[in-house]
Every structure is written in C-alpha cells, then in structure tokens.
Design a protein with these regions (language model features):
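Short, charge-rich, low-complexity alpha-helical interaction segments
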Residues: 1-19
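N-terminal cationic and glycine-rich segments that engage phosphates or anionic surfaces
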Residues: 7, 32, 41-44
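Conserved small-residue packing positions in alpha-helical repeats and bundles
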Residues: 14-15, 28-32, 48-51
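Hydrophobic/aromatic side-chain positions at a characteristic register within alpha-helices
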Residues: 19-22, 35
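Structural recognition of alpha-solenoid helical scaffolds
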Residues: 23-26, 54
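Terminal alpha-helical segments
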Residues: 25-26, 32, 61-63
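Short, charge-rich amphipathic alpha-helical segments embedded
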Residues: 41-64
Length: 65
C-alpha cells in the first residue's frame, strides 16, 4: 500500500545518496531530521537503507582482510 511505497521510496533515495557520496552518518542525520518532523515512514526507509549499507560495509571489510 501507500505506506510501503513511502518506505521504499526513501529506502532507494537513501541508497542513491550513498552512491553519490553520503555515508551512513550523513544519512542518520537526515533520518533524525525526518524523525523530528514526525515523518516516521520516511525514517523507516532511511533506517532500512542504513542497515543495508552497514551490512555491505561489513562484508567489504571481511573480504578485504
């Protein structure tokens, strides 16, 4: 439904921002800004992207060792 659409839109936007050079900390700052505005679905999308990014970075670190 619409709620899932909002979550996934912000998930993909956050991943796009990551590809363009923002790191997980930058995305966290953006997420907290949405949280202050009580836009929780947007927050959830960004949070999911941060979780995925941190997972990818961990795998990359393991592979590089």
């Amino acid at each position: 439904g619409l709620k899932n659409d909002i979550i996934y839109q912000f998930y993909y936007i956050a991943l796009y921002d990551y590809e363009k050079g923002n790191d997980a900390d930058d995305l966290r700052i953006i997420m907290y800004d949405y949280e202050d505005k009580e836009l929780y679905l947007e927050c959830e999308g960004i949070r999911l992207a941060i979780e995925y990014i941190e997972f990818l970075e961990l795998i990359k670190e393991i592979i590089d060792e």
